């Protein structure tokens, strides 16, 4: 059933119909469309278009349809309706006859779809927030279990200074917490209802749009009808949030792919999130993580595509805006799936503490400690930096770590070095000295874990 046609003397070409129809993807808005229609029927009572009895009949039929949709949403795809609005209205007319044709009074598909999409976005943000917090909790739990797992920290993918696996986990907790705050912030701007704005100039019926917004669970109604039906910056905002969130998950995945590699060998992933090779029987591939990393690109693409779609559109509604849904649906689905998968990866991960500690002791990760030691002895830092660089060259030449050089070797570079240098070159000393807020000291890490647990409880 088409919602238009009186103006036309020829039927649409079937090829155009297939090109134009959106039911194959906007069927996902069925529940929101029905909920919005129930609220609209109540608004029509307040302006005398519907009687209370008519509204009750419509609401009952819409609620029956809602249950049918929840039981089998795929049934919608068997229809040749143009879009979800046409499908819902057609089904309603099947149930209540001519009365169903009164429901669209004063309403346009322009404000209808804007409302449906905002309702869907609000529901989906709630799901994303839950998944995000579940992953944060999984990271905090993994951190708590691995506070003593010393490993190398990297800059430029070269061993830099010792950290702990717990500190690494907590770094991603911070990123995810910012992702969470962005979603919460987006939810505030989503929480305004466009219903009642009509096609572009507002509805001709004196409907209380604030009351209507409240019936739909919105905090308020939008202030400008042109803007309400023609902008999709809330879509851009969620796509931006998804793009940033997926970058964080991609980096998380890349780190663990490296940690799991034969070259690093810091962790072993569970069999539940890995796969094998059809040719090489020894392989255990980190496919879950590689897919998280790979899926990041499609989310960035959805954001870029939507920005390009909107950038040249004149006010108000244009059919181009039908392109807002597929990329949004896919991007948020992908982000949600990846949040769940990242949590699953952490469930069963094994940290190889001896190998991590061995790697942390290599690569002269304690060189900065020697420089700080010299500074404490009165040597200017820039000079100390140069002295330690020379000492590292000597250690490399001898094939030894810094702490294995003799005192005589070290004193060749600075006479202020004494026997008390050796304790400060230990891994434990390196960690304990980083005791300022946010540092890697055991005390700071334990405090950060407790604070994160309290925030997430």
From Swiss-Prot:
Coiled coil: none annotated. GO terms for biological process: arginine biosynthetic process via ornithine; L-arginine biosynthetic process. Pfam families: ASL_C2 (PF14698), Lyase_1 (PF00206). Keywords: Amino-acid biosynthesis, Arginine biosynthesis, Cytoplasm, Lyase. GO terms for molecular function: argininosuccinate lyase activity. Pathway: Amino-acid biosynthesis; L-arginine biosynthesis; L-arginine from L-ornithine and carbamoyl phosphate: step 3/3. It catalyses: 2-(N(omega)-L-arginino)succinate = fumarate + L-arginine. Its EC number is 4.3.2.1. It is found in: Cytoplasm. One of its GO terms (cellular component) is cytosol. Its main location: cytoplasm. NCBIfam families: argH, PRK12308.1. Belongs to the lyase 1 family. Argininosuccinate lyase subfamily. This is Argininosuccinate lyase. It comes from Klebsiella pneumoniae subsp. pneumoniae (strain ATCC 700721 / MGH 78578).
